[in-house]
Structures are given as C-alpha cells and as structure tokens.
Amino acid sequence: ALSIKTDYADAIWNRSLAYLSLKDFNTGWAQYDKRWKQSNNTSIPFQSSKPYWTPNKSGRVLIWPEQGLGDLIMFSSVIPEIYKQSKKLIIQIDDRLIPLFKRSFPTDIIYYGVKEKITEEQYDFHIPIGSLPLYFRKELQSFKHNNGPYLKADTSRADNLRSKLLSDGTKNLIGISWHSTN
C-alpha cells in the first residue's frame, strides 16, 4: 500500500504497530502519531494554540487523554519520567482513573476530569498521553525505569475484597481481565 501511496495513514499506523510488536520502539513510536489521521480514528485531538511538549522544553505541561482506559493505564507508566522534566504537571484523564493516579504518582500533580475546562493560561505545553513513549520508550532498556508496579491499589478496598473472597474457605482465586475493542 505504501509503495502506491507513501502517505497512506492507515498503512503507516499499522506499520508502527508492527514495529512496536517487533520491539523496534524507536521506529514504531516515531510513526505512532499517524493514529490521528487513520480512516477509522474516532479520537479528537486536543485543540490548543500552545506548543507540543518535547524533552527540551521546561514549564507547565498538560497531558491530555486519548484512546481507552487500558491505553491510558499503559501509557501512564511514563508519568514519573515526564514529571521529572516539567516544572508543573497537569493531567486531564478519565474521571475513573483520578483516584488511582493520585495514589500512584507524586502528590503535586494536578488532575482534571475529561469534562472539566482547562484554560491555556494553566499550561505552557501540551502532549497526548499516547505520544509520551516517543520520548521515553525508545528501546527495551528504557522500560526498566519502572522496575516494579507503577500503580498502587486502594489497600483498604483490596484488603476488604480479599477478606470477602477468602471468607468461605476457597483456596483458589481467579483474576479477571478485559479486552478492549477500541
């Protein structure tokens, strides 16, 4: 397809996913931004006159959401790294994830739900959360920055659930996972 139409966004997007699956992160993430131009894209990019954040820019950085909950959770592994490079970090995220993120990341990060208004006076630069790996996950070694769990469960809820599940004497517990369709 790309030999016929070199700028065919769907093919470039699919190629980026292929590169990522082959662990060629540098090439895969470099082409990942074509997701905005693919024919079945339903995400609307954040509109702002402020510039995109890049690693050489220091200031107040707004990270805005895209894709589904699973993607937001996956990309959030990079938050500690961009936090270190920003003067102030502001994250707009699905409301359901705010408590989890508040437990898991530095306490001075500011969070907004997806329906809350953020004005351009509040930030200097912005970036979609799915674009962060372009700067922080270029090689397999870069994933080692997270040498353990990066999300923290609500220990009270987890303990209550564990007690409830174990109260009937059952020895085997089965975890649940989901698969997103977006």
Name the predicted role of every residue range:
Residues 1-182:
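Alpha-helical solenoid repeat scaffolds of the TPR/TPR-like class and their adjacent stem/linker regions
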